[in-house]
Amino acid sequence: MGAQDRPQCHFDIEINREPVGRIMFQLFSDICPKTCKNFLCLCSGEKGLGKTTGKKLCYKGSTFHRVVKNFMIQGGDFSEGNGKGGESIYGGYFKDENFILKHDRAFLLSMANRGKHTNGSQFFITTKPAPHLDGVHVVFGLVISGFEVIEQIENLKTDAASRPYADVRVIDCGVLATKSIKDVFEKKRKKPTHSEGSDSSSNSSSSSESSSESELEHERSRRRKHKRRPKVKRSKKRRKEASSSEEPRNKHAMNPKGHSERSDTNEKRSVDSSAKREKPVVRPEEIPPVPENRFLLRRDMPVVTAEPEPKIPDVAPIVSDQKPSVSKSGRKIKGRGTIRYHTPPRSRSCSESDDDDSSETPPHWKEEMQRLRAYRPPSGEKWSKGDKLSDPCSSRWDERSLSQRSRSWSYNGYYSDLSTARHSGHHKKRRKEKKVKHKKKGKKQKHCRRHKQTKKRRILIPSDIESSKSSTRRMKSSCDRERSSRSSSLSSHHSSKRDWSKSDKDVQSSLTHSSRDSYRSKSHSQSYSRGSSRSRTASKSSSHSRSRSKSRSSSKSGHRKRASKSPRKTASQLSENKPVKTEPLRATMAQNENVVVQPVVAENIPVIPLSDSPPPSRWKPGQKPWKPSYERIQEMKAKTTHLLPIQSTYSLANIKETGSSSSYHKREKNSESDQSTYSKYSDRSSESSPRSRSRSSRSRSYSRSYTRSRSLASSHSRSRSPSSRSHSRNKYSDHSQCSRSSSYTSISSDDGRRAKRRLRSSGKKNSVSHKKHSSSSEKTLHSKYVKGRDRSSCVRKYSESRSSLDYSSDSEQSSVQATQSAQEKEKQGQMERTHNKQEKNRGEEKSKSERECPHSKKRTLKENLSDHLRNGSKPKRKNYAGSKWDSESNSERDVTKNSKNDSHPSSDKEEGEATSDSESEVSEIHIKVKPTTKSSTNTSLPDDNGAWKSSKQRTSTSDSEGSCSNSENNRGKPQKHKHGSKENLKREHTKKVKEKLKGKKDKKHKAPKRKQAFHWQPPLEFGEEEEEEIDDKQVTQESKEKKVSENNETIKDNILKTEKSSEEDLSGKHDTVTVSSDLDQFTKDDSKLSISPTALNTEENVACLQNIQHVEESVPNGVEDVLQTDDNMEICTPDRSSPAKVEETSPLGNARLDTPDINIVLKQDMATEHPQAEVVKQESSMSESKVLGEVGKQDSSSASLASAGESTGKKEVAEKSQINLIDKKWKPLQGVGNLAAPNAATSSAVEVKVLTTVPEMKPQGLRIEIKSKNKVRPGSLFDEVRKTARLNRRPRNQESSSDEQTPSRDDDSQSRSPSRSRSKSETKSRHRTRSVSYSHSRSRSRSSTSSYRSRSYSRSRSRGWYSRGRTRSRSSSYRSYKSHRTSSRSRSRSSSYDPHSRSRSYTYDSYYSRSRSRSRSQRSDSYHRGRSYNRRSRSCRSYGSDSESDRSYSHHRSPSESSRYS
């Protein structure tokens, strides 16, 4: 073992062709002779050429291709230079020799491998102790000099894959003569000390840099290992890494025990190494220097002599350090208010989960207790604790966490983190005020103060640097999430989850879901999707607050969805008022609500959600308002009993989906609120979002979910695993219910299924659907409509975007309506099953809206009545539209959603065309049944909330036309006041929709007048009102589309593939059009092309919407080629309207041409009537739309809206009336939408709608975004600042995407609104094409947009590719990606996004184009990144696209996430 006997070798390193020094290694040839021989021979190059690589077996000229700060630097790939090559001197790989030596210190030389016994030539040099690598990698040497070179390399900037940007090469290498060994040893003695010192300094610098780079590294690390979770928190990491890592270094042994042990270990190690290296003589020299360096580092400060001293210094340094973070022991330092919050987030998570159980405990007491809990976690347990908390919340969180954790606990981590972060954010904000904040809060406060709005999401991050890392990593890596989740994920993440949940819960109800609810909600597919949408919306309004609730809500989506609904709703209100408290409640409620979504539904939920939401987040599970919802949920569950087994399955799926959505929401919120963080998060968030998206994709539900998620604002991340789960579950749902994911989509598409399911368990699907809807809706409602405006309606239409908004109200109404629906659905369920299958594609969208209303019942009624109502009920619809608009409260909206869907074909169209008429009738029924509820719900929603709601609804509307209807219904209350004439307009819209076949012109004239009156009436909610108007338009169109969709879907069930031709023929019919779209994507492409002239002209406006829907539908049903064609068309231009339109138009074009066209015209007319306001909004909205377009490249809807604007502008030039509208709108759009222009061109038809919608939505979008995110009013200083921040942030994540997204933020909101509406249509399509589903989601990601967009884009793109491969999945993912960003940005954006998404769904390129338009570089970047991530996360995401595929994708997503993270 003589050190002298140990061989030494050297590397001469150059960085960017500048020599920086020599690294000397000593190899433990006495311990690992074979490994050492391999290394030595590779240094000397004496072995000639490799057998497998054919290259010279020598390290000379090789690079250090992977550099992870505070972890290691890796090289030795002499053949490929990227980590994929290299071979040993023995040929290929050789076995792991032994694991005697441990990675217990820095500067050890160890073999890299690809698994067991796969040692080649690649090695790595640790820069921190890495005990997690023990038993995995063979340590065979150590560095005896050149530590500064290693540190220099370690500190190089790296890309997302940890590749240093600089060229780090071994210019020379060789084996040293044994004689120099003594000198080397001498050097070694000094250098080890120096090494130690270097290590220390490296650590210190590393520690400080660790905050930023450590985030990346830890994100990666997390991706790689969950072990790093403890380190994941920056503060902990800094302290802990500085302390622990450095301690291990000091020790050189793995013992991170007392300093005495450490020093002893160090001494032993030193002695050992010196003995090994040389003689024990080195001991004294080596030992003292180490302490000195450490002394500076503070960690091992006294290591030199006093081992206790280090502790004292540690403590003292810790105290100073601790002010920013936790003490090394993990103990929260009271002195620092920052970390104080650290625990509460977890405690918040705990609180959220535990509070549910122990709501009686006073918040401050709980916080203290949780703080104690956090105490342990601060070190690294925090996340674990969080996990535990999550698990404790298992009833809510557990489904989330178990599902998430078990499924993809990266989801849980992410979701947890996001949810917690969000909840934390809101809670923290509240607590900051209370000053009961924990460490996290202190940090958060700092960060929050800086980016309070922006960092709400980041709050998670700030709350814990680790958390932030965690968050970032969450977004960045599934491992991140996982680790986050694992370590402190649930705790911190939980707290974060709450924060994120608030933001992302809404944004990613799934994120909150993330843990488990996320999955559930999303899994519930519609639940998630809706939850997500809602969540996002809520997220926007009270992004964080909702997110949080959503997190829980989504988490619980299965059971919680219901709870989620009411909490969301409440959360929405609270979100604005008490984001923090509401979130937990919301989460809890979401969880519980999911269970009883149906029974609790509309009537009670409006009250309960408010009640639920109002209870502080502290009320967690035990909330009383919550309990009524929960009881109702249980009632729903009773009804859902048949579905319960499925629901259980869905629970997982939903949880996944929810997780995904939550992730998304969180991401989106984070995105909005934390562009910067989100840039970091963006990756993770995006990933999550993709996850979410995946989930969304997984089922249309996912799309919706995402839309909601997106609406909610944060998109992000952690969605992947849940997606896997959700997908798994959703596959269940999809199959069972068109997959839970499908559940959402499936809710639409599965509306038949849903009817079946509802029949199976009227409560279950309702529960699930409604839960999802609730989740989404509630999120949306919570954030936007805390009041639970037409939750049902919103849930349906807004399912994606609005669902979040109207989650509560929808939940309530959904529950009530679900109950009624369930009954009706039971009656008509069978009819609907057949119908629904047809509807599935179209009806998916339709169903979403309808489902959201009385999902089952309404849908069945809608479907049954659809035809009747279509002819006979149109007047009714008109009236109901009016009453919807007037009441537009939850009950009315629930009912109205039908009526509104009828009124607003856009809105209901997505749900299903059949719903248009059916919905009228059902609407009548439900309106009769729930007018009070809706009214009350709507009424309960104050104008402020109304503004929120409006915004969110708009966003929702953007996101899904079905959402549009909901949005408008939801807006009903605010809109009632503001949209008094808008309601009339919508009634007229409904009439017109009915009359559309009779006369477009009449409608056009009618609509514009009313629109004008309404448009200006609600200046309060500038964006909101416009969004509402857009919702009107979209609702009308969507209603029609959904009617058609539903009818078509029914047909589709019967004539799935036969209908391709048949439906094209039927395309003359509204029903056929939608189904044909969905079914006949191939046919559609042809049909689009063939029908394009006719449909294009007449249906241009509708075509936009329909195109999006069709694109979405096409994507799922259509082949990738078709999608590509559509997308290309979309990308192409206004022609996208043409092809895309043709897509929707071809089926819908003939029959629907009149109606949708009129709808569009109406929308446009309304917009035209409000040209000034609309233009103003449109400018914003267009900006948003553009950004959305860019963001919304995924956001087909958004892009489509912009595109629709563009396309309709262009196409509608033919349609002069529309063109005028568009011209007014489009001009701002062109100005603002320069970025969006290409995207808009891509989705021109959709964009027109979005434009029309966006103008209304835009302010709303902005507001929603801002509100959801930061509760900043558009135009306010904060808004401006935030925009700037987002702009800065977005470019960071995705230069183009970010930039575009920032402007797009408003646009995104508006875009999202239409997009959402569209998304709904899309979602239907998406149901078929999970891809479409994703589209929606992405809308939500607007905040996340900047980074998220890059990620979302990437994901979406990857998915788009995937989608191509699996058109649905990828497209969906792609779209979702965008949607996420977009949604995050703003619901409106979601809408825009959705069209884009749709477009994107059609063609990856369309989205890409949009994205490119928005951020071509971002897109490319994103795209590549997304590609990688997509592979990682989009894989899942892709899988999210297909319900069935989605499920497996969902699983993929988990891995994907992991992959992505790693």
Swiss-Prot record:
Biased composition, Basic residues: where in the chain? Answer: 221-240, 329-345, 423-459, 543-568, 754-774, 988-1013, 1377-1388, 1425-1435
Bias regions of kind Acidic residues — which residues? Answer: 910-922, 1022-1031
Q: Where is this region: Arg/Ser tandem repeat-rich?
A: 1311-1348
**Has the keyword Isomerase been applied to this entry?**
yes
Any one GO cellular component localisation term in the record: cytoplasm
Q: Where is the composition biased (Basic and acidic residues)?
A: 241-250, 258-286, 382-402, 497-507, 775-800, 823-870, 885-909, 1032-1072
Disordered: annotated span: 187-591, 607-627, 658-1072, 1129-1156, 1169-1215, 1251-1462
Q: Any known activators or inhibitors?
A: Inhibited by cyclosporin A (CsA).
Going by the UniProt record, its keywords in alphabetical order are: Cell membrane, Isomerase, Isopeptide bond, Membrane, Phosphoprotein, Repeat, Rotamase, Ubl conjugation
Gene Ontology biological process terms from the UniProt entry: protein folding
- Record's Pfam families? Pro_isomerase (PF00160)
Which regions are flagged for Low complexity bias? 198-213, 524-542, 699-725, 736-749, 801-815, 1331-1351, 1359-1376, 1389-1410
The segment(s) forming the PPIase cyclophilin-type domain are 10-175
Query: Which PANTHER family does the UniProt entry name for this protein?
Result: NK-TUMOR RECOGNITION PROTEIN (PTHR11071:SF257), PEPTIDYL-PROLYL CIS-TRANS ISOMERASE (PTHR11071)
- What name goes with this protein? NK-tumor recognition protein
Organism of derivation: Homo sapiens
